Amino acid sequence: MRKRVYKFTSAQYGISNLEKKRLKLSTIEDLNDPFDLCPLDTTDPAVSKAANAVTSGVWKTKAILCFSRNWDNLLLWSHYGDSHKGICLGFDIPVGDPGTNFDTDVIYQPNLLQIRGPEDVNFDLANRLLRTKHESWSYEQEVRMFGLLSDPPDAKGLNWIEFGPDLLLREVIIGAQCHPTVSKDVVEAIKPYGDAVKCWWAGMRTDAFLLVKQDHPPHWHATVR
């Protein structure tokens, strides 16, 4: 069983991902939420010390890849899709397969996690820390994958995960404000995938603040030279 998740990116990096069939894994330094990975009340110094020991150990060996369950969120396009000038990659990933690191839905809540003391810092808590965020982030509808940093990084110090059975590219959605020339480059990058990957354009509804998938470029593309 699989489910569809979405990765927003600029057109430049998206085209590179399509051509090289891979996505970049993020380290803790790349994350944009200072509470990420330790959403815990650490008023007690003993709790703080124990939690830090757990989380620092995790991030010596793991990296993260973030997706959304939705492709049509206007804010996600603005924040991660280069202000609607980028693209969105749709992947099918395994659901509930213990052999993978997928299907980790983020939990959103109003308050920090609470524990009685350092004796409660264990594997189960570490798992909750990895997937708990403040409710203000709930618009992202985030799904996380955790990968190992066992392979050496590339020359720029970056780690990657290859497209494959557990990261199956199924669709590419071109942003509503993507320039026609860039759109053509995206289409060319998709061609080697054949019928396995569907290309869409994000269209703007005329009667609501909503995006829709279209199988053709928006009409305004024809007026741009």
Where do the PLM segments sit?
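Partner-binding and oligomerization surfaces adjacent to conserved cores of proteins
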Residues: 1-225
